[in-house]
Amino acid sequence: MAQEVIKIRGGQALKGEVEISGAKNSAVAIIPATLLAQGQVKLEGLPQISDVETLVSLLEDLNIEARLNGKQLEVDTTQIENAPLPNNKVESLRASYYMMGAMLGRFKKCVIGLPGGCPLGPRPIDQHIKGFKALGAEIDESSNTSMKLVAKELRGAHIFLDMVSVGATINIMLAAVHAKGQTVIDNAAKEPEVVDVANFLMSMGADIRGAGTTSIKINGVEELKGSEYQIIPDRIEAGSYMCMAAAMGEEVILHNIVPKHVEALTVKLQELGVDIEIEDEKIIIRKQTPYKNVDIKTLVYPGFATDLQQPITPLLFMTEGPSFVTDTIYPARFKHVEELQRMGANIKSDEGTAVIKPSTLNGAEVYASDLRAGACLITAGLIAEGVTTIFNVKHIYRGYTNIVEHLKALGADIWTETV
């Protein structure tokens, strides 16, 4: 069967400007959250990615009027109806689990297919389920393909998350906005996307305090009204372009960026020796090789993001000595290692840590096993001698708006082909 591939002829310097998209990890939660509104919602600054289109079509399955126009989405929930959500759409992206919290909050019941997304090893939703149960939901998991959630009523509860989880923190917030009384989420995730979702819910009239700290308090309200809301910039897309610019950038200017959100990456790139200039809403990057070797350990925000350990890895082949990358969040997130080895990289991974040594990369045929592995392979392709062909690019399009066009505009020799 024919499929699209991305091809890159490496070695071209990057120069120019890129406008960073709205945050994927905010958008995929805020779109489901619109169904909690009574009336009309307008979202601005959405990333133009396939995950957004899938979630909009899930809203339409609930008889919600949704008009997606580029970066803008208008939603009218006046005619909303509860309906089972089909497995074929839900399984294509993991963030469809936010429909559970939103539908539970709105209807006190839902039937939804089991979520999909990138295969990153064990990513259970047990913390989400724990939260829903604490709020009064009964959960039927007897089907292999779907899950049924029902609550006679939702009541506020004190929920302590066993592990810090962005998804569970947001999903419990969505379910709790209409619950009677106060819900407290302790050991809550502090990521900017959690704050963004809370700000959106508050723009509709929700009573939420403490988002961005480890303890979030939600006082249930009867009704949420419509609103207009602008989504924050995508710190992971920004970080990925920062890594590409550090690899091959003569001078790359990134606009629509919140420097504080990429601070952990910025500090690590400066340790490597990258020339970085920071302004209010933009960052300028210039390549300054050879780089110094560094060690990286992923942590929850504000630590080094797990989503950026793959995109930064190709830079570590350009250093003077060995580097170590440890992923404490997803220790199985090293499927890119085998693909980099095909390109001649001296890299090995074991039990959540990769050992990376200076290497010359050569173009090869490689496979994007997940979204951020795809960004890693693009960066590797920009550095490599010869042509790199990346297969399974659907993962890349799930998270990066027009990435081929953006890189082409910066001077990369990059194109798509159908094979």
Swiss-Prot record:
Keywords: Cell cycle, Cell division, Cell shape, Cell wall biogenesis/degradation, Cytoplasm, Peptidoglycan synthesis, Pyruvate, Transferase. The keyword Cytoplasm applies. Phosphoenolpyruvate binds at K24, N25. It is an enzyme of class 2 (transferase). Belongs to the EPSP synthase family. MurA subfamily. The modification 2-(S-cysteinyl)pyruvic acid O-phosphothioketal is found at C118. Signal peptide: none annotated. The lineage of its organism: Bacteria, Bacillati, Bacillota, Bacilli, Bacillales. Cell wall formation. Adds enolpyruvyl to UDP-N-acetylglucosamine. InterPro entries: Enolpyruvate_Tfrase_dom, Enolpyruvate_Tfrase_sf, MurA_subfamily, RNA3'P_cycl/enolpyr_Trfase_a/b, UDP_GlcNAc_COvinyl_MurA. The keyword Kinase does not apply. Its EC number is 2.5.1.7. It catalyses: phosphoenolpyruvate + UDP-N-acetyl-alpha-D-glucosamine = UDP-N-acetyl-3-O-(1-carboxyvinyl)-alpha-D-glucosamine + phosphate. The active site is at C118 (proton donor). This is UDP-N-acetylglucosamine 1-carboxyvinyltransferase 2. HAMAP family: MurA (MF_00111). GO terms for biological process: cell division; cell wall organization; peptidoglycan biosynthetic process; regulation of cell shape; UDP-N-acetylgalactosamine biosynthetic process. One of its GO terms (cellular component) is cytoplasm. One of its GO terms (molecular function) is UDP-N-acetylglucosamine 1-carboxyvinyltransferase activity. Pathway: Cell wall biogenesis; peptidoglycan biosynthesis. UDP-N-acetyl-alpha-D-glucosamine binds at R94, R123, P124, I125, D126, Q127, D307, I329. NCBIfam families: murA (TIGR01072), PRK09369.1 (NF006873), PRK12830.1 (NF009470). It is found in: Cytoplasm. It comes from the Bacteria.
